[in-house]
Regions:
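Positively charged, small/polar-rich N-terminal and surface patches that mediate targeting and assembly
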Residues: 1-110
Length: 110
């Protein structure tokens, strides 16, 4: 069965909600990495101070391709701020996964 890698870059205060949503939806396997970066807004300016890079959380999970739309919609619901969302809420990237191997056994997963 084909799989995809879903990478979500979300606000730090939304990461736990996204992870809980994925767990509740039946997708417990998530890798979480703290990252810094910027999007189209090129950082944030508060008064005279400019923050070039902002803290975010990168969440990664591999899922069956058939579940892609469902999982992406759950992530959006959990990560969005406000009723319509705001700049800086994040991005979701979906990429095909060619092969998966288990490190402990060295075996290719099907």
């Amino acid at each position: 069965m084909p799989h995809v890698l879903v990478r979500s870059i979300v606000r730090p205060d939304k990461a736990d909600a996204v992870m809980a949503t994925l767990l509740d939806a039946g997708y417990p396997a998530v890798t979480k990495v703290s990252v810094f970066g910027r999007g189209k807004q090129r950082g944030l300016k508060v008064g005279d101070i400019h923050y070039d890079e902002l803290p975010k959380e990168l969440l990664m999970t591999v899922i069956p391709v058939a579940d892609k739309e469902f999982v992406v919609s759950r992530i959006i619901e959990a990560a969005r701020t406000g009723t319509k969302g705001n700049f800086g809420d994040g991005k979701i990237f979906v990429s095909p996964v060619e092969e998966v191997y288990t490190v402990s056994t060295g075996k290719k997963e099907e």
